[in-house]
Every structure is written in structure tokens, then in C-alpha cells.
Amino acid sequence: SCPAPATTFIGSIPSSSHSCGLSRFLINYYIPLFFVVSGYIYKEGRSYKENIEHKAKRLLIPYFGYSAVLLAVYVLMGRTLAETKASAFGILYSRYCLYDTTVVKDNVYLFTVANGAMWYLTAFFAASLVYHLVIDRCLSDRKFLIGTLIVLTAITMALADIPVLLPWSIDLACVGTIFMIAGTLLGRAQFFEKKWNIPLIAAVFVIYILTSCLDPGINMSIREYGIYGAFSVPFFIIVGLTGSLLCIWFGKLIENTAPGRFIAYVGKNTIFLLAFHIFALEVVERIASKFIAIPVPGGAVVPFVLYHALRITAAVLGCLAFSEILNRLKKRLRRKTR
């Protein structure tokens, strides 16, 4: 069975744990994991048009729908017309900020309605446009596969240092395609269905730690592949692939346990969580601030870590509860329309 449901949410935890100092090794695989898992479960037989229509329905309808909900909430909270226009432009441009953060200090931040995590949905769609163009040929022609991977890497490196972050993460589409192709190749080889190979897992773990140390500062959302600019791209690909392998292995390890089943349930609500977890974290923080002094970085470690762990837990559970209510309402509406 595919380990995707058990692993996608594991990958989403580090972004919220960033302030707790856990992100150096955890966050590097966060976004690549989603691409790898998507490629892993790829099914042949659909036309290019069918694949893209499916992706548009799965990704773009939630993106614009949930973005509109968040925009409306912030308008009701008192956003000015100018702020609302800027937020609407950010939704259309779909990027965390406008410029490369290593080049421009006074950046233009575009996701201003707690929708920062939703850049992935349009990034994934952009990568899918490339992936579905080449994947079937890649599976049938090894020379074409190798050539495609080389060209995709070269394009990614060429776009790595341009000053502007392109809309819909077009500049990440090629590297996203590399991760998706890797996932598809793993799926065709039934890589995760094989018996546990402890020496291989240990080797992958060592490679992941070493490359993470050699090339720190990875943040795919703002096109930061590490500290070496364009030359960080190969390191980033290795980090993303090895980190994804480790995460999926972990998902396989726990998939038949109670925590594994819970994570599988969470995985089914990944898009809803991506859309609303930042807003939920803000709500929890506002409520908590009325009752306690919020622990700050540099203070006592235990209260700081405990607070953020509880804050993340409350936000996730709140999102899951709301998602469950919406799903039940949808089911009732479907029954009535039959």
C-alpha cells in the first residue's frame, strides 16, 4: 500500500516547529516530500488534458476558494481597501514575497491573510504542467529520462539567482518535476514494498545529515536552495530525496499503529490544513495571550517548547474538527441533491 497518507502530514509539522529550533534538519524535506509522494502514486492511462484538469480541480479550486474565505475574514476584521487590494494581488501572484530575499532587504510580502502555506498548491500545479508533459516518455525511454533530468536541473540552476520570485512558483516547476519523477520511479520499482534494508536506511540517513550540514539555509518557498546559490541545487535535490525517503520509511514503520492511523487521517485533510493552519495558530495565540504571558525566544526553554507544542496541537485539532464538520455538511447536501 502507498505510504502517502501517513507521510504528508509528517512533512507539514516542521514549518510550525520552526520557532522551536527543530527546523535545521526537519524542514529540508518538507516540500520535496509532497512532490515525491505525488509522483509515487502516479497512474498511467490519462491524457495530458485529463491529468491537468484533475490537478486544477484538486489544487486550484481549494486555493482560490480558501483564499477568498481568508480574505473575507480579514476584511471583516478591519482591513482597509488598500490592504485588501494588496492581499488580492498576493493571492493572484501566489508567492510569499516578490523578490529574492538574498538580494533585496526591503521586500514586498504578498501573503498577508494567513495564507502563506498555500503557495504550494499553485507551485504543485505549475510543476504538474511540466511533469505530465514528460513522465510517460521518461518511463519508456531511459535516455530521454536522463536527458530530461539534466535539462530540468540546468533550468533550475539558471533560474536560481534571478532577482524576482516568479508567480505561481514557475521557477520551482522544474525541480518539483524532478522530485515527482523520482517518486514515480520509486513507485514503479515498488521501493517501499520491499523488505527493510537497514544498511541502506542508515546510509540514506548519513547522506541526509551530511548534505544538510554542507548546504544549510534551505527554504524552497522562497527559492533558497542553500548557501551556494545555483550550485546548491544538486545538494538540495539530494537533501529533498533522502529526507523524503526517511520520512516515508518512518510512515511505513508506524502505519499500522494508533499514531499511524491518526496521521493517515490527518493526511486526508492536508489541503485544508495547509490553507488554515496559520490562521488557526494566530487565533490560538490571541486567545492564549489573554490568559498567559507568551514565552519568547531566548527565555526558559521548557515553557517555550511546551507552549508551541500545545499551540500547534490546538491549531491542528481545531482545523481537523472544522474540516470534519464541513465534510459532514457536504455529505448531507449530496444526499439531498440525489
Task: Describe the role of every protein-language-model region.
Residues S1-R338:
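Alpha-helical transmembrane segments and their immediate juxtamembrane cytosolic regions
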